């Protein structure tokens, strides 16, 4: 009986975690600047990727974000390593890699995702950040 309850709880927890993994959600973090990132912001939006050296999903995320940014005028893809920027990781409450933050033209964080995001979610988050879609 107890084993069955534990299995049900573990399964429910796994399903809930899987549903949130890589999903874009609103973020309460204030603005970030070029000084914070050490690189220029995009004129329309910035895809900020927080990665680590031994993170397998980070490579796929890098390819996805680079491709989306390359196809979108004024969108920059900036990647920072969590091990060299612990100060920023703490400020942004980074708990796992990859974490993706979508910044508007003035560096305001509009969306974030932990884990590998879906392309459609990144494109939709960019539309919100640039004001091309309703939030």
Enumerate the predicted regions with their spans:
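Short active-site neighborhood of thiol/selenol oxidoreductases, capturing the structured segment around
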Residues: 41-53
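Thiol-based oxidoreductase modules, predominantly thioredoxin-like and allied folds used
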Residues: 73-87
